Each structure stands twice: as structure tokens, then as C-alpha cells.
């Protein structure tokens, strides 16, 4: 086992050498990116891997392992994100995917990853206007009165701006693809797949699917058609009055440019952040103290095999809202009393504070699960890349769903098979899960081991918390399954 491991390391190092030689031969930008990745990312991976193997070999207690991993995270997190921000593209996409996993990603990485959900590096508006003019084959100002220089958000392959249509005066969002985004993605995928082939082969099938699915994001005209289809489907759903999908302006959509209805609201994460700040303030705690307390409660519940809590109950939320309203109005009254009219010693804008809404987070999460479940099992047409950066809390109280670049379609036959597997995972035994996976869905493995099949089904279609991975981190558990 150790021999094979060292062979893999040598092969990886040899590949770096070959890449460096190739750089001088071809001077291709994609090759430069590959060399940069291997030169900067591989030593970080090796540092983690060596410590992992050493700790396993000497059977170091879990608490000691956590301390060592914390030091490694502190040392490497900033360097990892320097690599991400330097290479952009697919690496930002990976960071965005990681940002949704607070239960998995260490805090040193999570805080940086969350910022990349809609704050990825952006290009100046002058370049955006040039791309629009080239793609639409007319000057941008023939279509738009103005384009806001500040991006609404920037993602892995492009960015979005608010604009005003010249003919109608309507406010729209304009999504523009960065030049070379597709070329760099193809090159980066080769690099990542090569890395996994040598060091994390269990992840290769997942990467193959990611590559296939992500390629659909490079045609914004197709995304406009996806928006139309999903929007029409949801208008016929039980959630029509509670969710909104923007209407695309098909006549202005090309492979590189997508023009659509502008939805007024804030990012879901911004709303939840304000919600948590309000709760912390009412409980006399800092936001960090609230998070620490909640994390401890979650760990205790998971250790007992219980689901984590998603927030205050409906009754607790109403009681908290009333208490908060009374406190803020009382402070407002104090500020208006004689003697305080000029100096206003209480530095608080009560009206602004009251505009920060307390959210029924469990209700919002249930709605999102219901909507995406409806897309999958009823419509057979769903967003293959849902993450918090693509979800808005609209001013009218609805949930806004944006970014349908990755839309997956599945037949009724496959939906039925997937539904049977989902029910088995939720309610059935190992035998039920294996039956749904192998007999119904036709999945095969080398040894057809029932333990292996059940765990793979849970990792892919259910969850990957410690109750599933038996106390190991996901990477170690996947390697354990492969062995």
C-alpha cells in the first residue's frame, strides 16, 4: 500500500516536470495554468497527505488530529485561495460548491469560499460593453440606455450587471460570459482529472459528470431557453405564488449574452446573516457566540443520531419578533424624550433595524427543497447547480431562483427509479436500498458488496455526515470503501 502510494507521488512529480518542459515548448496559456496548479497546489496536498498517513500510522487520538488539522488549515487556507483567485474559472466553481458545505469545509476555507458565491473577480464595464457589442453585432448603446458599472455578481465564467433597455425603459439583468472561459475550463478539467487519477481516483466519476454538465453553461442562449421552460413549469406548480424565475428577453440573448428580467431582492445568505444578527442581539450575544453555540448543539445532536435544528420554531420566532419590536420602539421613544432630542445618545436607527426581517428559515428551506423536488420528480427538468448564490429573497416576499445554466432532464422512467431509491434511503433497510440501486437502477460494482453499495448510495443521493462516514472525514471514508 505504501509502495503504491510512493509510486503515485513519483508519478505526480514526474508529471509536473513534464508539464514544465511542455510550457517552454508550447507556451500555451492552458499549459501555463496547469503548471501553476501543480507547482502551487501539489505541495499543499502533499503536506496534508503526509500528516494524514502519519497520524493514521501512530493511531493519534482524534482530538490531537483535530489540533494538527487546524494548524494545517491556518497555514494553507490563504494560499489555496490565492491559487483559486489567480486561476479563476473552474477553481472558483469548486470553491463555490464547497461554500455550501459548512458541515464539511473547515472554517478557514469556508469564510473565504462563501465570498466567492457572487464576489468572484470581475472585469471592468468597458470590457463588458465591448463583449456585448461584439456578440449582438451592434453597439451596446443601441439596446441599452445604461449599464451599471458595478456588477450585480461575478461567477466562475462571467458576471451580471443591471441595465436599462432603450426601447421599453425596463430594468433588466445582463449576464456576460468572459472571453476564453470555455477554453480555460477544458484545460483546467484536464489538470484536475489528472490530479485525481493519480491521487484521488474515487472522485473521477464525479468529475466526469461535472465536466459534462458544466459544458452546458457556456451557451447563454440555451440558458435563456432553460429559464423559459422552468418558469413555465413552475407557473403550473403549487409554488407559483411563492417563487419567481426571471423572464428572459430572448431577442437579446446570444451564446455570450443573456438579458433577463431584473428581480429586486437580496441574496439568501445576506438575509440569513441579518436574521442571525437580530437573533444574536435579542439574546445578548455576538454573532460569533451564537454560531459557536449552535455548532456545539449541532455536534451534540449528530452524536446522538438526531437531525440538526434549522432555527427557532414558528412560535419562538413570533415571540422573538414581538420582543424585538417592543425593544426597538422603546429605544426610539427614549431618543425622542426631552434632553435627547439634539444629542441622541442611543446610536441606533430603529427603522433600519426593523427593516431587517426575522426569517422563518425552516419554512424557506422546506420551500426550496419542495421546489427542487418538484422540478426533479414532477417536471423532470431541474437546476443541476443550485447553491445559495443563486437564491434571492425578493422584496415582495417571494423566493427568486436564478442561474439555470446547468439544467438536467430525466425521463419519467428514471424519475420513478430515483423516487424508489429516495424512499428506500429515507425509510428502508440496507436490502431495500441495494435492491433499488441494483435491480431498479441497474448499478453494478466489482464485488456487489451490499455494505459498499449502501454507503455509495447514501454518499451520492442522501448525505455524507459522520453518521454515514462512521466518524471519518469524507476523503478517508471514500478511500476506505475503495479498499
Regions found by a protein language model. Give the residues of each.
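Helix-rich C-lobe and terminal helical cap/extension of kinase-like folds
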Residues: 70, 74-75, 101, 251-254, ...
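Short pocket-lining segment of the protein kinase catalytic domain that shapes the ATP-binding cleft
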Residues: 120, 125, 129-133, 231, ...
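Hydrophobic residue at the +6 position relative to the catalytic HRD Asp in the kinase catalytic loop
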Residues: 389-393
Amino acid at each position: 500500500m505504501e509502495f503504491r502510494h510512493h509510486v503515485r507521488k513519483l508519478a505526480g512529480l514526474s508529471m509536473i516536470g513534464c508539464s514544465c518542459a511542455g510550457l517552454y515548448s508550447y507556451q500555451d496559456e492552458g499549459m501555463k495554468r496547469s503548471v501553476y496548479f501543480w507547482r502551487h497546489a501539489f505541495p499543499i496536498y502533499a503536506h496534508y497527505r503526509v500528516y494524514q498517513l502519519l497520524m493514521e500510522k501512530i493511531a493519534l487520538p482524534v482530538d490531537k488530529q483535530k489540533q494538527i488539522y487546524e494548524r494545517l488549515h491556518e497555514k494553507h487556507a490563504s494560499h489555496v485561495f490565492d491559487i483559486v483567485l489567480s486561476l479563476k474559472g473552474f477553481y472558483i466553481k469548486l470553491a463555490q460548491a464547497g461554500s455550501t458545505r459548512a458541515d464539511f469545509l473547515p472554517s478557514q476555507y469556508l469564510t473565504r469560499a462563501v465570498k466567492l458565491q457572487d464576489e468572484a473577480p470581475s472585469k471592468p464595464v468597458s470590457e463588458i460593453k465591448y463583449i456585448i457589442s461584439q456578440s449582438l453585432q451592434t453597439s451596446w448603446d443601441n439596446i441599452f440606455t445604461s449599464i451599471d458599472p458595478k456588477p450585480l455578481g461575478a461567477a466562475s465564467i462571467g458576471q451580471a450587471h443591471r441595465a436599462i433597455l432603450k426601447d421599453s425603459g425596463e430594468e433588466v439583468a445582463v449576464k456576460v460570459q468572459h472571453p476564453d472561459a470555455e477554453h480555460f475550463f477544458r484545460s483546467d478539467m484536464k489538470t484536475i482529472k489528472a490530479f485525481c487519477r493519480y491521487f484521488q481516483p474515487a472522485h473521477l466519476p464525479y468529475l466526469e459528470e461535472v465536466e459534462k454538465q458544466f459544458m452546458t453553461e457556456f451557451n447563454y442562449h440555451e440558458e435563456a431557453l432553460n429559464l423559459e421552460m422552468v418558469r413555465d413549469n413552475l407557473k403550473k406548480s403549487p409554488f407559483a405564488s411563492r417563487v419567481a424565475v426571471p423572464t428572459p428577453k430572448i431577442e437579446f440573448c446570444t451564446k455570450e449574452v443573456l438579458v433577463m428580467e431584473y428581480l429586486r431582492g437580496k441574496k439568501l445568505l445576506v438575509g440569513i446573516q441579518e436574521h442571525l444578527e437580530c437573533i444574536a442581539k435579542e439574546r445578548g450575544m455576538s454573532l460569533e457566540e451564537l454560531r459557536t453555540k449552535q455548532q456545539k448543539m449541532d455536534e451534540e445532536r449528530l452524536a446522538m443520531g438526531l437531525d440538526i435544528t434549522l432555527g427557532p420554531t414558528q412560535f419562538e420566532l413570533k415571540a422573538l419578533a414581538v420582543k424585538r419590536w417592543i425593544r426597538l420602539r422603546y429605544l426610539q421613544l427614549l431618543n425622542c424624550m426631552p434632553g435627547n432630542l439634539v444629542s441622541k445618545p442611543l446610536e441606533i436607527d430603529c427603522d433600519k433595524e426593523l427593516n431587517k426581517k426575522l426569517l422563518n428559515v425552516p419554512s424557506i428551506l422546506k420551500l426550496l427543497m419542495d421546489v427542487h423536488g418538484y422540478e426533479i420528480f414532477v417536471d423532470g427538468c431541474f437546476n443541476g447547480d443550485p447553491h445559495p448564490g443563486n437564491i434571492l429573497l425578493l422584496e415582495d416576499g417571494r423566493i427568486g431562483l436564478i442561474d439555470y445554466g446547468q439544467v438536467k432532464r430525466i425521463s419519467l422512467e428514471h424519475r420513478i427509479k430515483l423516487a424508489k431509491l429516495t424512499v428506500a434511503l429515507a425509510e428502508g433497510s440496507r436490502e431495500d436500498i441495494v435492491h433499488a440501486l441494483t435491480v431498479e437502477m441497474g448499478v453494478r460494482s466489482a464485488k456487489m458488496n451490499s455494505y459498499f453499495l449502501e454507503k455509495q448510495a447514501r454518499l451520492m443521493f442522501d448525505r455524507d455526515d459522520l453518521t454515514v462516514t462512521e466518524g471519518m472525514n469524507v476523503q478517508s471514508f471514500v478511500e476506505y470503501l475503495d479498499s
